[in-house]
Amino acid sequence: GLEGGKVVGVTDFGAPRLANWAGNLTYGSSGVAHPANPEELADVVRRSARVKALGSRHSFGDVADTTGTHVVLDRYDDGRAPVEVDPASGVVSVAAGLRYGDVTRHVQAAGRALANLASLPHISVAGSVATATHGSGDAVGSLASAVVGLELVIGDGGRRTLRRGDADLPGAVVALGALGVVTRVELETVPTFDVRQDVHVGLPWDAVTAHYDEITASAYSVSLFTDWGPDGVQQVWRKSRLAPGERGGTRADLFGATPATTMLHPLPGIDPVHCTPQLGEPGPWNERLPHFRLDFTPSNGAELQSEYLVPRGRAQEAFAAMRDLGPRVTPLLQVGEIRTVAPDPEPLWLSPFDGPAVGVHLTWKPLPDDVARVLPDAEAALLPLGARPHWGKLSHALVHDPGSVAALYPRVDDFGALAQRYDPEGRFLGGYVERLLAG
């Protein structure tokens, strides 16, 4: 409550500075607010010259940074159930700060499913959507593509509700936190389904060159794990969609790759206890689409990540470029992952998925200086192909030349105008987003 002109019990000033999950970034915020209700949130926004929502802190760059107050919604209660599934429309309304793994249990209990999930269930809904985070699958879009509505608090502390059909929604879904503090997200669901996960090992590069489209079309969601060395793809994870109760089957040979006979972790030699069940054992979508289980911490954060979203028609050129960089990249990698993403059904202004895309993802060892030296060369090879850096991961261009990234998005000026309208005083600017919008 308010007492003597200051917000009591809401802001931890003087607390140790927050760091992100990976530990590679210490945020610049001067305090952290944990508003308990809409009134407290509006008050924090109005009182702060600079303010920014902070999610599960799984971004590797400074997309969510601010010099002012960070807002964390872990104690926020808008008087509604955190997860509400509308039985008529199938739309699920979600408290924005929740993690996907917590949301999906409720959705599954209601007999519904989200079409896709990211590899980690530990990430917040609002933060994932705002950065166009994604899983894999030729026919399934990013997490942002499921959004049909948003509620947010904008620069003057007022509330906005956007739904499908509102002119602002396509600009507000992938918004990098620049329009306000999102408090609720509405997601489309589908009837529940099961998934079986089969892993193949030892896919030669020749097979990737000749049969990539067939490989990615062979299951609902396909991920290729490689270190970009001469040996090719070490593991292919194939997640096949089944009707509940159906068992499905696998294939003995996958263009030279053979079925794994034990559970595997994407990183060689790591205990797969953290991973979702493989070996063709069917289970509900929410326990198979992520690579990692919610009840295990997937790693201690001792890693860095980059990712480039390449137009699908240029994928083979991107693979060739990465293989050429192999001698420099492989020694720094924990693992690389290649995924596919379907285009957004309705264009989202700052989404990299305006057409079919292939994600070239890199999980680096925690060697920030070495990674920083190789990123410019990787981007010099990939960005001319039309690749866009993932908004939440490490990128040389996002830090040093955000204008070059802005130029990859035809609607970026419209987005800037939208941000100006929702936040005329620039309260929600910070990190690279400020430089991106400064043009």
Regions found by a protein language model. Name each.
Residues G1-V8:
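Short, Lys/Arg-enriched N-terminal segments with co-localized hydrophobic residues
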Residues R288-L408:
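Substrate-recognition/cap regions that form aromatic- and gly/pro-loop-enriched pockets
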Residues P87, Q108, I154, S351-P352, ...:
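Non-transmembrane, aqueous-exposed alpha-helical and coiled segments at domain scale
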Residues G61-R80, G135-G157, V181-E188:
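Structural signature of FAD isoalloxazine-binding scaffolds in flavoprotein oxidoreductases
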Residues L385-G439:
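Activity-critical C-terminal alpha-helical subdomain
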Residues G23-H122, V129-G137, L224, I338, ...:
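Glycine-rich N-terminal segment of FAD-binding domains in flavoprotein oxidoreductases
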Residues E40-D43, D102, V208, Q235, ...:
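Short, conserved charged micro-motifs
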Residues V148-R328, L332, T340:
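C-terminal substrate-binding/cap subdomain adjacent to the FAD-binding core in PCMH-type
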